[in-house]
Structures are given as C-alpha cells and as structure tokens.
Amino acid sequence: MQIYLANPRGFCAGVDRAIAIVNEALLRFEPPIYVRHEVVHNKFVVSDLANRGAVFVEELHEVPDGSIVIFSAHGVSKAVEDEAERRDLTVFDATCPLVTKVHIEVAKFAQDGMDAVLIGHAGHPEVEGTMGRFNHRHGGRIHLVENESDVEALSVQDAERLAFVTQTTLSMDDTARVIDALREKFPHIQGPRKDDICYATQNRQDAVKHLASRCEVVLVVGSPNSSNSNRLRELAERMNCRAYLIDNATEMDINWFDGIQSVGVTAGASAPEVLIQEVLQQLQDWGGDLPSELSGIEENVTFSLPKALRIPMTQVGK
C-alpha cells in the first residue's frame, strides 16, 4: 500500500504562536495560568498544556480576579475584553492575527453605521468573537449566514451600505458560492480587499485536493471540534475518497484499508507533527510502504509573541 503525505499540513503560524504564548506564560509566571477556551482545537495539545499547569475554562467568571488569563487563538468579543479589564486580569491575547484582521474590518463597518454579513458556522468560538466585535450603537447590524439558503432569506437595512467578512477556517469552495449568492442579491456589497480565509486554510485545502486525486482513502489528523480539519475531510469526500477524521493513530481501523492500494495523510492546522508520524508508523506496521511527501507550497509565515513574553527571562521583574 502506497502512503502519500500532504504538503503543507499541520501547525500554522497562528497555532504555533498561541501554543508558544501558553508555554511562555507557564515558564514565566506562578500557576495557575488560566486559558479561556481551548487555546487551539486539538485534544493532544490541550491535554499536554493542562498537564503542565494550564487551567482551561470556558468563561471568565471561572477566573479569580487579578489572575493571569490567555485568550484562545479563536479570538474573543469586546465584552470579554472589557470584563477582563474590569476585573484586573492580566491578559495575554493568543488571538490569531488573521482573526484580528477580521475583527478590525467588522469594527470599521460598525463605526460607519453599515450592516455586515459574517459568513461562518454558528456556535464556533471564532464566529462568536467576531460577532461580538460589532458595535450596534451606530445603527448597523451584523448578520450570520452559513449557506446560500441563508443568503436567500437575508434581509438588511440598506443594500447599498453593506459589507461581508468570513470566518478564517471555512471551505474555500463553499465560501465562494456564498459570496457569489451575496453579490447576486446585493450587487453593491463590499468585501475585504484580501480574502479573510487564512493562507493556511487555503494551502491545506489545495494540498488535500492534490492528495485525494491520487488516493483511495484519506486520513485527516485533527480533533472533531476543529473547523479546518472537518473541512479537509469533507473536501476529500467530495473528491470521491473515503475520508476519516482521527485524533490519533489509535482511532484507525485496519479494516479501512482492505484492498486499498493508496492512502493519503494530512492534518488540520492545530494537529502536531508527532501525531502525524504515529499515524504513518501504524500504516507501515500494517504493511504500508515508506511515505512519499507530495510537493506543495512552502510556508514561512511567523507571528511574534506579545511584547511582555519576548522580554528575556533575565530582565523579567527589573
């Protein structure tokens, strides 16, 4: 059985930064270090950080006044920021800079009194944070749509003063169809100068298309609550591959590969390479060939840590 490995795959710059922020905080400060929501959507990563002292909570009321808290990579609403300031919490913001870019866009539309349309998945923490960045005091409203049917039912205050943004981890193909529907219904709608779907999401979706074109089965390493990992699985299925989303190698079933000549492996943006390597090793133990890594875009994006976490440890407290 041939094994193909997608390129790029796994960690993106925003995930690297978010995990590094938690790691640095654990090194520099006395526990407990609180993290609002899973810092990234991966069970292995969250469990590892929890074992080293991070305390994960869903809401700030679980954090004692005056504590250190880290906001997850998915971002938070303005109300959460305000509550943290009110309660004298020391905040390290691990929001992905590409999510922050969308927050800035939404805030500007609100300031201008426009309606905004957010293309995204209801209930996802990134969507909740972005919706919570829209200030309604200037007369505008923000609307959430997930698909073309939502667009069809959408009613806005002024179709000529309307803009859209998107969640950063969506299916590019699905989102393009929703944007087309918006532009058809609202010809004057404004969009971002550059696509809000992040570079890593785009690159991993392109890579899984390349992978699925030559494989019968595709394995996506990622947690069930990872939006971008789910989109990779769906994309492989649309290309007529059997696709499985797995947290780790223990979730694989040898029967998946009966009679299979080729299997592809990729990973969502929050899945660490160690889990991918364990999957590859299990496939080889079951008779697979040495993996062949496909060609792909080389990623060299990096995001810096907050200034307070970049100060050399020897200078902390001086």
UniProtKB/Swiss-Prot annotation:
Gene3D superfamilies: 3.40.50.11270, 4-hydroxy-3-methylbut-2-enyl diphosphate reductase, catalytic domain (3.40.1010.20). It comes from Psychrobacter arcticus (strain DSM 17307 / VKM B-2377 / 273-4). GO terms for molecular function: 4 iron, 4 sulfur cluster binding; 4-hydroxy-3-methylbut-2-enyl diphosphate reductase activity; metal ion binding. Pfam families: LYTB. This is 4-hydroxy-3-methylbut-2-enyl diphosphate reductase. The lineage of its organism: Bacteria, Pseudomonadati, Pseudomonadota, Gammaproteobacteria, Moraxellales. Keywords: 4Fe-4S, Iron, Iron-sulfur, Isoprene biosynthesis, Metal-binding, Oxidoreductase. Isopentenyl diphosphate binds at residues 41, 74, 124, 226-228, 270. The active site is at 126 (proton donor).
